[in-house]
Amino acid sequence: MDHAADRHRTDLMTITRFVLNEQTKHPESRGDFSILLSHIVLGCKFVCTAVNKAGLAKLLGLAGETNVQGEDQKKLDVLSNEVFIKALVSSNRTCILVSEEDEEATFVRPANRGKYCVVFDPLDGSSNIDCGVSIGTIFGIYMIKDGHEPTLDDVLQPGMNMLAAGYCMYGSSCTLVLSTGSGVNGFTLDPSLGEFILTHPDIKIPKKGKIYSVNEGNAKNWDSPTSKYVQSCKYPADGSSPKSLRYIGSMVADVHRTLLYGGIFLYPGDKKSPNGKLRVLYEVFPMSFLMEQAGGQAFTGKQRALDLVPEKIHERSPIFLGSYDDVEEIKKLYAAEEQN
């Protein structure tokens, strides 16, 4: 490749250009959604820089506070949360923000208010910060139900009502994966340009994968269908090769690998945590939305994940998501359990 020539290319598909192209498909659009996405992208760039400098800037370690989930807050968590709140409010396109780090939803003051609700986890996998494992930001976007004064009901909607969802992974490269409801596309940050470039157009998850991803440390507390499924991954009844176990412990990294290579990601409910650990609004819904848009499935153990109607902003749910055929297998095990 001629890197010197590549440096001067201006025909690259940047995320801004991509979003504007999508906007032209909706003649009635006023550009509000594009402006909101540009502010989310800016927040991701800012957090990416902070993550890269974290060790040098002494941002690692605890901030001495705990968040609503009872988890110790990292300094980077606090910073990332502030970055996204400010970026979203300053877009003048949002009315309600729900963050994993804040106990209450943030209602934007009327002067800065728009028609979108954004749910987000500013820094998922933050327990991995100190050891350099990939971490990320997860987000989902809803529109308020109508022109009334915004209430919590505007965010307590089923995942299938989401307009867009995505995540930004801060790892060996900074990758932003986005769906606006018509497929999934991946963008990689070019540090020399400061731009996200389309590198993974129209991502489709393989129909069946060779990898399963689950925390087996919880195995003694699993229900029967989960135990049977993991057993079948290790010892297939048909004598075929077993699936490989890959588990990082950072949802963004585990789901990203599942999306690209196929397979299944599981965070089941168990005796200790019947509702699982992952939060519905800003973890389960965005990742399930992306999986379905890429041709996969997402299941809670009882129903399609995107059909869930949350009652609280920090509600949790079990989740099984990934390749269509792999999720279909665990759905059959739960169906058989129900019949017994």
Curated annotation (Swiss-Prot):
KW Cytoplasm (keyword) present: yes
Enzyme class: hydrolase
GO cellular component: cytoplasm; cytosol
Residue numbers binding Mg(2+) 3: 121, 124, 283
GO annotation terms (biological process): fructose 1,6-bisphosphate metabolic process; fructose 6-phosphate metabolic process; fructose metabolic process; gluconeogenesis
CDD domains from the UniProt entry: FBPase
InterPro entries cross-referenced by the UniProt entry: FBPase_C_dom (IPR044015), FBPase_class-1 (IPR000146), FBPase_N (IPR033391), FBPtase (IPR028343), Fructose_bisphosphatase_AS (IPR020548)
EC number per UniProt: 3.1.3.11
Name of the protein: Fructose-1,6-bisphosphatase, cytosolic
